[in-house]
């Protein structure tokens, strides 16, 4: 086995996964009662009780560091990636782990399993192959109260909040089984929490923050975003919500995204040590132009309407921000290009006069299509197309651009058929089974390859005016029809490939193709490299230089 390879667990090893992979689920089985799941032998107590360790568990644990936050978007995901890379640079075999992630940004492993993009990036930082055990529970929200539940990389079904909480026992078993098998194969596990451990109303249902830290016996770093303000009050408030046992797990605080002279923070750090007995172990500066995908939209540099005026010679690209937008990381490589003005559009009044309109993926395509029509954005898109301008759709965006969306299984809508925008000769049908495919290489209309991954329920048929010019290069598919992953109709392009713009050569070739069509001079060379390896090394260098690594190692029983 090569370094970083992780053996795959079979469905039989995890009853929840076995249930999630059942292909014959009929609609009358949709209550997700998990009756086919063998119950856990013990109902593990919740965080805040004397112990969450199952009886008989060995006291020896793999050294573990856990990043928790005072809030969402505090920087946990990025810092977890930083410590993964630091430990790997120091010669340790590392695995990331997040028990439960609620995110619409996901990817596909080599084994065809779906997991959060954040843990995929962290795996790359650890130089390990992404493995669904690193993110055993993925929640993909489709409404304010419900999510699709993905267990160990396979869709289980849709649940509302109370139904999900009712499966705590089985879910906890899936989490701990995944953690134990992963931890047994590495030297250090870097865990990430979710949201904040100080959410008192959710604490009884916790399986991702302090309960997980307790199970892993992890050294916990509490991360806060000082750029938002109120950081030290957030540190104190979170600490006050902890039990004595939880406070003993807390090793230190990390001040994130600081701008200025760090010596000015000295009095605040002394106060934290005096009043909580826990030191600040890092002050991480605000890092500009990092170009590492963020977990939350709030962390994206281009995810704000006010992105400056368009400069001469640049392409103005408007990304239509659907209410249930997924995989907006698809556009991060474009944001790094100096001749691109990438901006989100959420309302018709933000439209402007874009050169290119991008329609991203969506977790709820039909409701988002309804939103586009109600908001007036559909009229903007149709007018843009009537003027012969460029449109690019990805995944759900592809389906929206077609003539019709069929939903015979009622996956998204009670309506069996909904008209699309009619801009491409495509008809998409939501299938009961989900397509999860990594595409190492795909042929494209530009004659240069790209790649990516597919995550969708839709199966698309095309008419004669939609040319199937995106094709999976893998000859394992017996027919050309099975290789199709995208279409072209003049200046209207659409593909199921997430990550299609990650490839530097394809991205620049496409940009220059559009520039030439608009009468702008093509650059004919890469102006920006979307190189995660260099970005991760840069991140690790900054975090290492601004963290008390000696204390962090010592807290894990290392060095």
Predicted features by range, described:
Residues 34-36, 43, 52-383, 390, ...:
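Flexible phosphate-sensing "switch/lid" loops adjacent to ATP/NTP-binding sites
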Residues 402-460:
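A conserved active-site-flanking secondary-structure segment within enzyme catalytic domains
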Residues 13, 24, 28-31, 43:
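Intrinsic-disorder-associated, low-complexity terminal segments enriched in Asp/Asn/His/Tyr and depleted
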Residues 3-4, 41:
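Cationic, amphipathic, low-complexity segments that mediate targeting or membrane/lipid association
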Residues 11-14, 18, 42, 55:
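Ala/Thr-enriched low-complexity intrinsically disordered regions
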Residues 395:
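Catalytic nucleophile serine of serine hydrolases
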Residues 16-17, 32-34:
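Leucine-biased recognition of intrinsically disordered, low-complexity hydrophobic segments
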